[in-house]
């Protein structure tokens, strides 16, 4: 792995992101959401990895998404692999209090097939990420089993996310924003944790 480019990308993609401005400007269209992508110590999984939570601002101790993300690089592509965590409830709030993650490596991870994100630099400091091809990333949504389409644009200041789910049998859109992408601003960065000693 080319360490320096990987570390620079890790700084960009990690942090606390909030769409507060978007939600305040359009409260009927957009909920106020925070995304936390917190770097873990390298020794946790012997690789570059992150603990992620997504939550509504009004319910910060009840995240609707928790995952481990492992970062790797293949030539010019950065791969953000997604994993489910065994007994994830034990680690709720770990994005806010890292001490809650001390024993996370003792619990099994389950890779989410088809759900890795592939990021490529489109111009200096700006990256476009798309979910791996094949429509094999599945999410249960109510009684529906859906496949996911996802696109993320990110730089050191902003993360723009477009996620949607489609019925497997009909390809009909089942979930996702009806009013365009979610626009998040980075409000906290974790650069101090990511340097040449992050290994």
Curated annotation (Swiss-Prot):
Protein's name according to its UniProt entry: Chromophore lyase CpcT/CpeT
Give the domain of life.
Answer: Bacteria
Pfam families given in the database record? CpeT
Q: Which GO terms describe its molecular function?
A: lyase activity
Q: What is its EC number?
A: 4.-.-.-
The yes or no answer to whether the keyword Cytoplasm is present is no
Belongs to which family? Belongs to the CpcT/CpeT biliprotein lyase family.
Q: Which keywords describe this protein according to UniProt?
A: Lyase
According to the UniProt entry, the coiled-coil residues are none
Q: What does this protein do?
A: Covalently attaches a chromophore to Cys residue(s) of phycobiliproteins.
Establish whether keyword Lyase is in the entry: yes
């Amino acid at each position: 792995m080319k360490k320096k480019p990987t570390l620079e990308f890790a700084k960009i993609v990690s942090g606390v992101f909030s769409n507060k401005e978007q939600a305040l400007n359009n409260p009927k269209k957009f909920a106020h959401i925070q995304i936390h992508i917190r770097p873990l110590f390298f020794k946790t999984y012997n690789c570059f990895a992150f603990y992620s939570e997504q939550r509504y601002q009004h319910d910060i101790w009840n995240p609707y998404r928790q995952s481990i993300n492992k970062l790797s690089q293949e030539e010019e592509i950065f791969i953000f692999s997604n994993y489910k965590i065994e007994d994830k409830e034990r680690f709720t709030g770990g994005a806010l209090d890292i001490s809650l993650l001390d024993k996370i490596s003792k619990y099994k991870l389950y890779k989410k097939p088809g759900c890795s994100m592939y990021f490529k630099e489109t111009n200096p400091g700006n990256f476009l990420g798309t979910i791996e091809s094949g429509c094999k990333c599945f999410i249960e949504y109510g009684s529906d089993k859906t496949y996911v389409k996802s696109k993320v644009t990110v730089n050191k200041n902003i993360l723009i996310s477009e996620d949607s789910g489609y019925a497997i049998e009909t390809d009909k859109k089942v979930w996702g924003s009806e009013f365009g992408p979610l626009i998040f601003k980075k409000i906290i960065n974790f650069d101090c944790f990511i340097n040449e000693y992050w290994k």
